[in-house]
Regions:
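Short beta-strand His + acidic residue motifs that chelate non-heme Fe in jelly-roll/DSBH
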Residues: 43, 61, 78, 84-89
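Short acidic-glycine-tyrosine-enriched beta hairpin
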Residues: 66-80
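A short, N-terminal "cap"/entry segment at the start of jelly-roll beta-barrel domains
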Residues: 1-27, 108
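Glycine- and acidic-residue-biased ligand/ion/polar-headgroup-sensing regions
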Residues: 48-59
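Structural motif
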Residues: 29, 58-60, 67, 83, ...
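Ligand-binding loop in jelly-roll beta-barrel domains
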Residues: 81-105
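Conserved short histidine dyad/triad with adjacent acidic residue
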Residues: 31-45
Length: 108
């Protein structure tokens, strides 16, 4: 399949307050991620390289000890194996994450 409508894709809850619709090919995965106001994605790491762009809302993003407040249009790149954490502000947020290679645990 080459084309998708994200609104027709089932939503998967990754952790409480954080939901994603994922799409994948052979070597990369896209995730449209919606984060509830005040939600926190705790510090974690994975082997996958991750990049993304903020689509809506404000996030406090920490990568390898460096913290920035990100707004729509801001882009982040996280090398594999690097600690990162996300804290959502007073309103919901939405990001587009890109992973390589595909995160098998997010396929459904």
């Amino acid at each position: 399949m080459y084309f998708y409508n994200p609104n027709e894709r089932e939503v998967k809850e990754l952790i409480s307050g954080i939901h994603a619709r994922t799409f994948w090919g052979e070597n990369l995965m896209l995730a449209v991620v919606e984060l509830d106001a005040g939600s926190i994605l705790p510090t974690h790491t994975h082997l996958h390289e991750q990049g993304g762009i903020v689509l809506d809302g404000t996030l406090e993003f920490s990568i390898d000890g460096e913290t920035r407040t990100l707004v729509p249009g801001d882009i982040y790149i996280i090398p594999g194996g690097v600690n990162h954490k996300v804290t959502v502000g007073e309103n919901h947020a939405k990001v587009l994450d890109i992973f390589s290679p595909v995160r098998e645990e997010y396929k459904y």
